[in-house]
Amino acid sequence: MSGMWVHPGRTLIWALWVLAAVIKGPAADAPVRSTRLGWVRGKQTTVLGSTVPVNMFLGIPYAAPPLGPLRFKQPKPALPGNDFRNATSYPKLCFQDLEWLVSYQHVLKVRYPKLEASEDCLYLNIYAPAHADNGSNLPVMVWFPGGAFKMGSASSFDGSALAAYEDVLIVTTQYRLGIFGFFDTGDEHARGNWALLDQVAALTWVRDNIEFFGGDPRSVTIFGESAGAISVSSLILSPIANGLFHKAIMESGVAILPLLMRPPGDERKKDLQVLARICGCHASDSAALLQCLRAKPSEELMDISKKLTFSIPVIDDFFFPDEPVALLTQKAFNSVPSIIGVNNHECAFLLSTEFSEILGGSNRSLALYLVHTFLNIPTQYLHLVADHYFYNKHSPVEIRDSFLDLLGDVLFVVPGVVTARYHRDAGAPVYFYEFQHPPQCLNDTRPAFVKADHSDEIRFVFGGAFLKGDIVMFEGATEEEKLLSRKMMRYWANFARTGDPNGEGVPLWPAYTQSEQYLKLDLSVSVGQKLKEQEVEFWMNTIVP
């Protein structure tokens, strides 16, 4: 720990704590680390099938609480503490609709710790092999959770299995959500994108402190799913995140996803006027509105956010200097090795709740109406969409299946493939996958026609079948599913180590070159080429010329 900054008086605190640990006994086994902000004590766990213990450090603050005048503001660094921090319990969730969280646990057959929500929520959890200490220089994988920027937390994911099996450090993060994470006034008073700036703050903390837990700050891989993957893709595009990470994995989400960015101008002004009226601020300008909103209770703002959309990023000329497509076209982004992937039935169930009326079957007119209203496809293009997706489809089931495929193509497959091409053409190594295996444990909770739905791959990536703590990610996995999980853990960790997912014990994963080969992740892994070539061609050259 040579060269490490230690706050005056900490040596005495440390000595007293060690003495107490010796007297009490069990605390002597607790892992202890020093950071630039103070000492932390974690706890130890094990996972199924591995003899490697894992140190867990939970609820470590990476920024100051965004309360009072710091609400709707770029996060400030966390302050050093003189006391020993007990990092053994999960942090509170960022404000979100807790009913959604309960519902998702039932639908996905997962279980999370029961936690309260708070605006004081800028914390992260660290999972490290027990042998890791300052100087170990293990690869670091920083996870950004998904949830449409409206829900999610660091404590819905357990990195113990990945840490134990693959000898890497896992950091799970959480960031402000909804109105707390994205409110903006469209001017200098509140630029917005607070959630994305929280992520930059988390990565800055990792850069400055992860070495004390055994991680290598020069080998940081950021990864996420859905909104977490959009976050990863956005961080690649942002100049203020340059140098904070070195590899990136995007699972089912990229920054050019349609409908992602809030339109500027009159629509934003209208939203602000409605917001002022609902909350009783009656503000005459954005500075006054901001002052009024900062005085409102958290619960009141949470209720307001259910009536208005404040959960999407904006072009703020700071985090996003330009539109994502423009930045990709100009090659004005951080060109790092990347894995990009999708599931083969992204919109079949979890994301189709808005279209529940068609899950039993649909007709052509209803399907085209939904394409027009939900995806904002102009009416003059609808006949082209109909010819491509619904030609010679007559039964309600056929039309439903084509409609769900269309949604997945527009929202995930085409943006993912296009982003992979931009990254490839910028000279960075790219690897693409399509996840194809529906978890068998979900057979009785969703329709039989559903294949690999949105988020299905997460339990495999995290080795959920091998966890035995209070975060349950994969109950009832078959032996074949456990083998697939081990392969995916190895691919992801190999990539974190070297920027290449290939290595001993896993089938070859070809790079995404001009031939556009990709990996089909199923119980039997294989290689495909030009994923959905005709659909990508249709949307890129016919609808978006």
UniProtKB/Swiss-Prot annotation:
Pfam families membership: COesterase
Q: Does the keyword Thylakoid apply?
A: no
- SUPFAM superfamilies with a match to the protein in the record: alpha/beta-Hydrolases
* InterPro entries xrefs: AB_hydrolase_fold, CarbesteraseB, Carboxylesterase_B_AS, Carboxylesterase_B_CS, Type-B_Carboxylest/Lipase
Annotated Gene Ontology cellular components are:
extracellular region
EC number(s) given by UniProt: 3.1.1.1
Q: What is its main location?
A: secreted
Q: Which residues form the signal peptide?
A: 1-28
Q: Which GO terms describe its molecular function?
A: carboxylesterase activity
Name the cystine pairs: 94-121, 281-292
Q: Anything further noted?
A: Protein specifically present in urine of cat. Present at high level in urine of members of the genus Felis and Lynx but not in urine of other felines.
| Name of the protein this chain belongs to | Carboxylesterase 5A
Query: What species was this sequence derived from?
Result: Felis catus (Cat)
Taxon lineage: Eukaryota, Metazoa, Chordata, Craniata, Vertebrata
